[in-house]
Amino acid sequence: MVLLWEPAGAWLALGLALALGPSVAAAAPRQDCTGVECPPLENCIEEALEPGACCATCVQQGCACEGYQYYDCLQGGFVRGRVPAGQSYFVDFGSTECSCPPGGGKISCQFMLCPELPPNCIEAVVVADSCPQCGQVGCVHAGHKYAAGHTVHLPPCRACHCPDAGGELICYQLPGCHGNFSDAEEGDPERHYEDPYSYDQEVAEVEAATALGGEVQAGAVQAGAGGPPAALGGGSQPLSTIQAPPWPAVLPRPTAAAALGPPAPVQAKARRVTEDSEEEEEEEEEREEMAVTEQLAAGGHRGLDGLPTTAPAGPSLPIQEERAEAGARAEAGARPEENLILDAQATSRSTGPEGVTHAPSLGKAALVPTQAVPGSPRDPVKPSPHNILSTSLPDAAWIPPTREVPRKPQVLPHSHVEEDTDPNSVHSIPRSSPEGSTKDLIETCCAAGQQWAIDNDECLEIPESGTEDNVCRTAQRHCCVSYLQEKSCMAGVLGAKEGETCGAEDNDSCGISLYKQCCDCCGLGLRVRAEGQSCESNPNLGYPCNHVMLSCCEGEEPLIVPEVRRPPEPAAAPRRVSEAEMAGREALSLGTEAELPNSLPGDDQDECLLLPGELCQHLCINTVGSYHCACFPGFSLQDDGRTCRPEGHPPQPEAPQEPALKSEFSQVASNTIPLPLPQPNTCKDNGPCKQVCSTVGGSAICSCFPGYAIMADGVSCEDINECVTDLHTCSRGEHCVNTLGSFHCYKALTCEPGYALKDGECEDVDECAMGTHTCQPGFLCQNTKGSFYCQARQRCMDGFLQDPEGNCVDINECTSLSEPCRPGFSCINTVGSYTCQRNPLICARGYHASDDGTKCVDVNECETGVHRCGEGQVCHNLPGSYRCDCKAGFQRDAFGRGCIDVNECWASPGRLCQHTCENTLGSYRCSCASGFLLAADGKRCEDVNECEAQRCSQECANIYGSYQCYCRQGYQLAEDGHTCTDIDECAQGAGILCTFRCLNVPGSYQCACPEQGYTMTANGRSCKDVDECALGTHNCSEAETCHNIQGSFRCLRFECPPNYVQVSKTKCERTTCHDFLECQNSPARITHYQLNFQTGLLVPAHIFRIGPAPAFTGDTIALNIIKGNEEGYFGTRRLNAYTGVVYLQRAVLEPRDFALDVEMKLWRQGSVTTFLAKMHIFFTTFAL
């Protein structure tokens, strides 16, 4: 018995292998299985064909592994992807059990029980079709949840830290604070329990004043008015209150503060007290603000220049107040300087000229003036133009992050202006001193305008505090409008991609929405892409339509940066940050993720949106904690990482730094952190260029798209005629035709005479229009396809004459000719001709006039056919008459007028013919019946031997008067009864006799297999695939791997790229990577897979499952087909957070090979790892 593995449900078991050998085949005679129909073997994975039997029997039932299940079955120990009935295996690291039901059939998979969530999980993430996962671990205290790794401030003087693994809060006392340290929270200010970090403003002010121990007096601004107790390691909150105190007679020496801004803005809720108390506070604040304004105007101070209301955002780091330094100065008898409390970044201080302390910062400062020390001198001091108002806060007045909000495009911190009497209002105070920088003012006011657009979605109601100048109001207005336009444009692009109607926005009250324009332009790009045409820029569309059209045509999607959770380093009790430690830190970090110690989803800021058009020349791509620049196609990034130059142009040397910039920073101390100087964007709105603008060395350089050349003016572009300049790539036998920006190659054609080649086709030549005809004068040229003909111009026909007016008139031949008619005829003129009419001559009956009309001659009625002799009569002419006689076999009728036939058969019945007598006109004829032949005498009949004439194509039997034809086996008698036609057994038993191809032969049939890749089995009907790889009949080289497919094989080469080492036959692992980006973006492992499928597979069908091994809680993957799916046959889908599949979404109807590169990115514990699966997919016809 020989076993044969066949797919489950094979309908015909004729697959006996040829492995029986020649000896066995010779011993067992071939069994004739004609007409035998074998029953289908349902769910059979192992078959056997007994010697001499026509039908196979099932040895074992089971399930056949299909698609991506094939690899799971192999890993489960089931050879060749066949699972016996009743057995099972595990996938997805034991989370799913796949089993084959009793009796075989389809494999069904069932998820196992979900694992328990880890302890200290404060937030569970539920994903469809997946187990719940822990989204965040942390601590639970007094009914509130705190994220792991965060330090929070619990009033009045406690700082509590949640460990990285969660659990219980670790609390300690804040240094220098003398409050109540009981754990009871009954005395806490009213907390909004939907946000455990949000407190009411009024109570926070009271507690902050209490914690100061009397340092802050009634006239001071309460720093706590802006928010709740702070999370020491978290984000920051926009400054919500800047209140000016009554200006003292003696000003203390101020501390300069430069704020760069906090991370993404968050919102804090505040409750209000009674209406009476609010009105009193507002009146008091108005008086205080008026006092500050008057004092600023009188003394020429810069006011709050050191505290811009908004500024670019930066990373957040915890800091401490340098209280020891201030205490030392107070003990020495000097007037204490105001302390600057920062809520985001560490501060480095340096003392500049005139004792001014510079405090560069990356956070927002809350300013509170301290009261003068009792006993200090109060003599008036003339304000210095360098003095800057600065205030101090208690150490515990940190501003924490409130609850996270859904991430939006990150913009500048919240600083919109509400009402003049609002105690939480923020005004953009312009710089009034000569040293004030207009550029800084524009940035500050622009940020306020953007924030107003974010909060209010309009730009018409921006309030004016009365202190802004025209520069600030202009910047606010234009930045607000620009943000709304960009937002509406992005919405229009998304609407076009979702197939929405590109209509105007209903809520466009300002009339600045770009929704319809961007939607229409994106629709243009999508249509070009759908038609399969190349995506080319069209500068005539203008900005942003050209950019939007090109982006949608090329299918560019916004970069989606995954949210990365990085647990912070465990922090001990707050310590003092020295100046030396902070001196070397950067003011604005745009580095890698390692510079974000407390990164959680939503903490990252999009620097590309914060500084649009300033960071990169072409494209700015935001990353977690940083950004990087990219260039348009045809350009390369320069060494500075932000500017682009056309490919092929040498890099321009960097412009030397302006001396003015050097002198501007010469006054800053060595430990002051300089701010990055934004480069001017000379290519904004494409600059002066018509096509491509590039910034090189601070100047705009124009270049052109491929196929164009720069003109003499340096900004315009003209088309290059590649056909004339010999820049085309047309081969021999082709001719070049120039187009705008490119060219086309047309195959050279030889046209027949009369045709000329045009646009690759032979077109007719109009010889008449070109004047190349050969028509003589007096002829008119008429063009035809491939030729022409000459048509004579108008002339008169015969019998007409042209008059002087060109008209044709009749000629009277009777008068113009001398003798138009013969003698005896008269001339009669007609139109265009004439006739001759005989002269009248009267003759008797039976006579007519002679040719000359002079005499009468006899009419021969028998020759002219004017006689009236009947059928069977003979005409004899007589002078002036004729006579009718009867023919032989006829006789006259009883009246003697006509002739009738004599019926000889009736006159002598049975005596004239042996078989049949047939009467004819004037005679008779003898005939014989079928099968007989008339004898020579014309009367007798003789039998005919039809078989001698070989009328039958095969066998013949003669009988008396007839014959009978017979056919051999395998033939049948045709309808004519003579011909034997072959019986087409293949047509009668279509699909039953042979599994692949049935060849009809005379009298029988033969089964055939494909010429290559298959061999005939012992039953002579079915075909079996030849495994060339196992038999060694392939032609693959030693460096290639043979892979068998149905009916053929493929030679695959598994080579590892540079910087990779081959760890197995189909796996390559990366050896090293030079930097973080290369480690993140280059694949850590490259694995080759081979998949075989049959054509006509129903879609959608999962063909491959992919995921990390092993998987851990919190793992997240993203799949993407980066190569080989240009025709869209395949797609990717996630089954759960850590498992995805590649599926067939378009039916493959013909044999075809695919080579896919599937990239999987794994997010695990804050890091990203890339894996690459190279899949060789082969679709073949059904098994034979």
From Swiss-Prot:
From the Swiss-Prot or TrEMBL record, state where the protein is found.
Secreted, Extracellular space, Extracellular matrix
Q: Which Pfam families match?
A: ANATO, cEGF, EGF_CA, FIBL-2, Fibulin_C, FXa_inhibition
Give the organism the record lists: Homo sapiens
Q: Indicate what this protein is called per its UniProt record.
A: Fibulin-2
Q: Which residues are glycosylated?
A: 180, 507, 1035
Primary location = secreted
Provide the positions where the record notes the PTM Phosphoserine: 277
**Region Disordered, residue ranges:** 221-293, 399-437
> How does the record describe its quaternary structure?
Homotrimer; disulfide-linked. Interacts with LAMA2. Interacts with FBN1 (via N-terminal domain). Forms a ternary complex with ELN and FBN1.
Modification after translation, per record: O-glycosylated with core 1 or possibly core 8 glycans. It is unsure if the O-glycosylation is on Thr-347 or Ser-348.
